[in-house]
Amino acid sequence: MEIRQFRFHVGLPREVRLLHTTDNHLCLADERDGARKIALAKNRAEAFGASADVLCERFRASVAYAKENRLLYLSTGDILDFVSLANLEFARQTLEGCDYLMAAGNHEYSLYVGEAWEDEAYKQQSFVLVQSYFKPNLVFDARIVGGVNFVTLDNVYYNFTAYQLMRMKEEAKKGFPIILCVHTPFYAPKLYDFMMETDGSCAYLTAAPEEKIACYNAHRYRQQKADAATLAFVDFAAHEPSVCGIIAGHCHHPFADTLSWYRKVPMLVGGAGCSGCAAEIIID
């Protein structure tokens, strides 16, 4: 496992330490899930250049590291590659006894990966099942640890909601420094340029400006164009002084950038857990 180091400075009297992983992409299926998902599991594992067993072991190793080193464990989503009972059961069993936070990823709700337009209606086909296997609230959750308010929330389809903004305002009133934990990173100029150079078709970021997404194809433009509720959430976060940092995933490449909001806000994007990446984060 390749573990990088990252530090957020928020003015704490004592350090808070955690292990961040993201995009583990478990690819398990058995007879309960059916022949189609068994075939999907094999094909998807091969797409990540590993066997299903190797992907499982990389996830298990990250959780074991957090337990052994008494670190809070943070996942910013895509623990699963697709919805299956085998994936859900392995994830729950592996996380048993681990102190963890979680922001869901888009693959947490993916039934067959790429077979349909994914939106809120699509998500609701599997949301209740998926939520039942994880302790944190996957829509919006918040937990204060060592004087830091870790806010974990769903932006898996590049959007935020009015409900999440309402909850965010409530958390801001508590007066603790906030670390926002999401699956899809916020737009930041250097990250945008890096992702466009790496992928070539789009940057896979939340709330990228119109002029930055105009070059996307029709599917990606529709998928990643920010709606009014998303822009309202980002505007609040940008102006809220308690927001001190952002931790995200989704891009499969480790990257650190700074959001040039009304103040500088650091953002860490984790490397892919399916490739054995993790980050030990110190908040002081």
Residues covered by each model-derived region:
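Active-site glycine-centered loops adjacent to acidic/histidine catalytic or metal-binding residues
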Residues: 23, 77-78, 105-106, 183, ...
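His/acidic metal-ligating clusters that form di-metal
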Residues: 59-72, 149, 158-258
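Short, solvent-exposed beta-strand-terminating loops
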Residues: 13-37, 109, 181-204
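Short active-site segment of divalent metal-dependent hydrolases/proteases
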Residues: 26, 80-81, 108, 149, ...
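N-terminal active-site segment of His-dependent metallophosphoesterases
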Residues: 1-87
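Residue-level marker for buried hydrophobic side chains located in beta-strands
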Residues: 18-20, 73-75, 102-103, 180, ...
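Charged, glycine/proline-rich intrinsically disordered loops and linkers
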Residues: 33-50, 119-127, 196-224
